Amino acid sequence: MGRAETHRQRASERRVERNRWRASRRRSVPSPSAVFRYLSQFHDASQEEARQPRKAFIPTPNDALRGLGKVNAEMVGLVQGHIGHRQATLDMDATLIETHKQEALYCYEGYRAYQPLTTYWAEADLIVHSEFRDGNVPAGFEQLRVLRESLAHLPDSVERVMLRSDTAGYQRELLKYCAEGRDERFGVIEFAVGVRVTDEFKHEAAQLEESEWQPLPRIVGEFEVETGQEWAELGLVPTWMGHSKKGPDYRFVAVREPLRRPPLPGMESEMELSVPVMQMPNRGWYKIRGIVTNRELAGDEVVRWYRARCGKGEEVHGVLKEDLAGGRLPSGQFGANAGWWAIAVLAFNLNSAVKQLALGDQWVTKRLKAVRFALINLAGRVVFHARKLLIRLARGHPSFPLLVRAHRRIVALAHGPPQS
């Protein structure tokens, strides 16, 4: 304590205060300078010289950044060793991180940003792969390469892989790679990918008879809720899909929903900017969307399986950007920001592992705010006694049983995954 705080106190009183706070003050987190020095190791200045104006470019990660990717793969494998999923449904999605850094490039929405592309494992609630990118890099740029890297990071115990992606994944090489079984490890990869609604797509949808459109209710428990949406399969065959009679089958599923307020005359083009619409013969205006798949499920089941990804990608990116501070980029250096994002991915998977393996199923869906409230921000005392670490809480604290149960599960994890 400072002299001003102990002024006019007796020596015995000052001695009591010193003994009360005799532990020296130490940093609980690294200093900003140490953090910046650490993050600078992930930046490769030579890659910046390879950039070309107005062209999409992804810097090659250096050894340090690749090392974080290997650590993440090891963590995914550790969690998989305990939960044992045989199937991996991979959801690929990109997100925009708005920033005001001068080094950042403009995204398609017109502001400076970075745009990471993330591969999320739905069954395991883990991020398998996430590539940090500039804001001007399209979401579908080199998506096949990212998919192959994600497949390489999956644990050996995974036997089957399926893919879901928005319209950014509607790429010939990506779809053919999955449908033709080009992957040496997993073979044919079942997928459902959003389709860009082109004039040809609208033309095929307009040719369908009304009897071909099937209702698409929403399933709520054991009940079906009417949505007004309908689905139908199209006979659309793009040129690149029809080169061989022995090629894989691609199914195009269209979903339409009537517009509650049809566009005014001459305003149709403005409506196209927000959502694809089309006018059905003698039926009025509809919102129209499309999905391409190689799965053999019924069309309505394909739509529901595809829509299961909706919202989850935004939630995952929301946790990364807000809960784990991945969206608070610390530097103007691309590599430093990429390292910061990779650390946020590690924190996401660590948080998911703790919830699944230590806290229990009822905690899997809870955000980090709930975990902080119940487990982290607790008033207590940490005591070292007889070479043991003790945590003392208030008597009857509601989090006490949860902490004890989590501690026992963590100790059990030290003995390795259960033997099959």
Question: Which residues make up each language-model segment?
Answer:
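Electropositive, glycine- and tryptophan-enriched low-complexity nucleic-acid-binding patches
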Residues: C107-S157
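Short, conserved catalytic/metal-binding motifs centered on acidic residues
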Residues: M1, H7-R20, S24-R27, S31, ...
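Active-site-proximal, Lys/Arg-enriched surface segment
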Residues: E17-T118
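Domain-level cores of phosphate- or acyl-group-handling catalytic modules
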Residues: P138-E200
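Short acidic, glycine/serine/threonine-rich loops at helix termini
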Residues: H100-L105, V128-F132, R172-E180, K202-L208
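A short, flexible helix-boundary coil/loop motif
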Residues: L350-S420
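Short amphipathic alpha-helical "interface-anchor" segments enriched in bulky aromatics
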Residues: V302-G339, I343-V354
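An anionic, glycine-rich sequence signature occurring as long contiguous blocks
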Residues: G187-E322, R408-S420
